[in-house]
A protein has these predicted regions:
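Conserved class I S-adenosyl-L-methionine
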Residues: 1-45, 56-60, 77-80, 84, ...
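Conserved catalytic/acceptor-binding region of the Class I
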Residues: 121-122, 128, 133-208, 223, ...
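Class I SAM-dependent methyltransferase SAM/SAH-binding core
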Residues: 46-98, 107, 122
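Conserved Class I S-adenosyl-L-methionine
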Residues: 3, 10, 27-29, 54-56, ...
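A short SAM/SAH-binding and catalytic strip from SAM-dependent methyltransferases
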Residues: 106-120, 143
């Protein structure tokens, strides 16, 4: 499937999922403050929140006194963000063709959006284009290890799902591997001397053993497409297996799922720095 087809698949999926996202995927919000710190967002910072979804990052940035603008490919996501944060600015736009002039933002963030674009390197290059010379990009991507959510879901799908042909898109863990990340950032105009790659872990608390399955089914895109293609008996087997996996993480009256992300940040080339990568 071409990049344009994958982009349309993602756009349509998020249009459908937008009304469920903020209730289902509270896990992404656990990384917002660290993301803003990595992007050096403070009072007065002009922030571009790429793949803004319902506006979690923009909302937190505004609480710091920053001036955020959120952009998302899905109109329904932008409408939801505007409803949640009526005093902030959100626009429909493509991370690969940002509708903003060169050097117009002090910081650019992308909270788990990089895995949802058809050309991740192009998204990095666009972020570089709209950054001021001393600005900073920060983005998150999932780690391949340390994520109970993926381990549980992947095991259930491997055992019970009928194979479904889907679009070819980036890995869920795109740029989490350090060498891949360095190569991409350098090629897109970022200074490796300013690069930081941190691993951030959290516990995602969900109220029921069924929460993860419901999130995957109603508020996801790629996995949701696989689930919707299953016959009823297969879908129920997957649901049951995921619920059993979640129950292993019981914590009082809820469930605490370990999750891990790579937090990556860098400034543009030519902005100064000591030439050494920071960790």
């Amino acid at each position: 499937m071409s990049g344009d087809a994958f982009a349309e698949f993602e756009r349509a999926g998020w249009e459908r999922a937008a009304s469920h996202y903020e209730d289902c995927w509270t896990d992404t919000g656990l990384f917002v403050e660290a993301l803003l710190d990595a992007a050096a967002v403070r009072a007065g910072s002009r922030l571009l929140d790429v793949a803004c979804g319902p506006g979690f990052v923009s909302e937190a940035a505004a609480a710091r006194g920053a001036v955020p603008v959120g952009v998302d490919l899905a109109t329904a996501m932008v409408e939801r963000a505007r409803a949640r944060c009526p005093d902030l600015t959100f626009v429909v736009g493509d991370a690969l063709r940002l509708p903003f002039p060169d050097a117009s933002f002090d910081a650019v963030t992308m909270n788990f959006g990089i895995l949802h674009v058809s050309q991740p390197e192009r998204a990095l290059a666009e972020a570089r284009r709209v950054l001021v010379p001393d600005g900073r990009l920060a983005f998150t991507t999932w780690m391949a290890q340390g994520n109970a959510t993926d381990e549980i879901s992947d095991a259930a799908l491997a055992e019970h799902a009928i194979a479904v042909e889907g679009p070819e898109g980036p890995s869920y863990y795109v740029f989490a591997e350090p060498d891949e990340c360095r190569h991409a950032l350098a090629g897109c105009g970022f200074d490796l001397g300013s690069l930081r790659m941190d691993t951030v872990t959290a516990l995602w608390r969900v109220p029921s053993a069924d929460s993860l399955f419901q999130a995957q089914l109603h508020a996801g895109v790629r996995t949701a497409a696989v689930l919707r293609a299953q016959p009823p008996e297969r879908l129920e087997a997957i649901r049951s297996a995921i619920a059993d996996g979640v129950r292993r993480y019981a914590d009082g009256d809820a469930f605490a799922l370990p999750i891990a992300a790579r937090l990556i940040s860098a400034g543009p080339s030519g902005a100064g720095g000591d030439g050494r990568e920071h960790r």
